[in-house]
Amino acid sequence: MTDQLRLMAVHAHPDDESSKGAATMAKYVSEGVDVLVVTCTGGERGSILNPKLQGDAYIEENIHEVRRKEMDEAREILGVGQEWLGFVDSGLPEGDPLPPLPEGCFALEDVDKAAGELVRKIRSFRPQVITTYDENGGYPHPDHIMTHKITMVAFEGAADTEKYPESEYGTAYQPLKVYYNQGFNRPRTEALHHALLDRGLESPYEDWLKRWSEFERKERTLTTHVPCADFFEIRDKALIAHATQIDPEGGWFRVPMEIQKEVWPTEEYELAKSLVETSLPEDDLFAGIRDNA
């Protein structure tokens, strides 16, 4: 009898799950995979990015509650489970020099202690596969970088009963694979950019490509390409549910859906660790697991 496949996606803030790997999650849900999103913070220090909602006094005063409601709506759209890790948003520091991070925020937590909270989730849910961000956080937000750190510690720590005793953290369990989300990769961005220009359409990616080198991003190894074009509409619907964070008329939604599906019908990942044999490149996060489950 085949064991239930389970995928855990670890994210920093509400809305990250809908902008990074959402179509992949929706695809796996449709196949009967149990998918759980773990959200590390409440996004309390996030700015209101939707111009139509800026200046709304209720939202500004109740941003934590509003973002939780948005997360719940997105969760229902994607069909996933979702749990909070309970840490406080660090905010994105700006200025030169950068100001210190606020006391008590996620990025200043002890890594091993914070990872212990994720160990509890892993031991309870028992996913074979975990997704998160690379060591740069996908982009250098302190909460994204911290999310990477605690996920990698928890991947190993979930099976370590000395570091995380079963009496406190639950029955030990070892996940089999951990991936980095790499959906915002240069090959995809360039392909969509040129596809739009070739069709005489305006591209929202031109400035993005010009600024790419400013982030000093190394080119990542895209090991895994998950076909999920049939779920792009669900992805966008979930993202729009985060109304405070997304302008539905902004550049994110300027690329016609038919072009996205034709030019780049996959979401990309980088296999960071695997305890099972697999052959690269992959088209399935459960490659090497599915046949043995």
Curated annotation (Swiss-Prot):
Deleted gene: phenotype: Loss of amidase activity on mycothiol bimane, leading to dramatically decreased levels of N-acetylcysteinyl bimane. Increased sensitivity to a number of alkylating agents and antibiotics including N-ethylmaleimide and lincomycin.
GO MF annotations in UniProt: hydrolase activity, acting on carbon-nitrogen (but not peptide) bonds, in linear amides; zinc ion binding
One GO term of the biological process aspect: mycothiol-dependent detoxification
UniProt enzyme class: hydrolase
Family: Belongs to the MshB deacetylase family. Mca subfamily.
Role this protein plays: A mycothiol (MSH, N-acetylcysteinyl-glucosaminyl-inositol) S-conjugate amidase, it recycles conjugated MSH to the N-acetyl cysteine conjugate (AcCys S-conjugate, a mercapturic acid) and the MSH precursor. Involved in MSH-dependent detoxification of a number of alkylating agents and antibiotics.
Quaternary structure, from the entry: Monomer.
Name of the protein this chain belongs to: Mycothiol S-conjugate amidase
Gene that this sequence comes from: mca
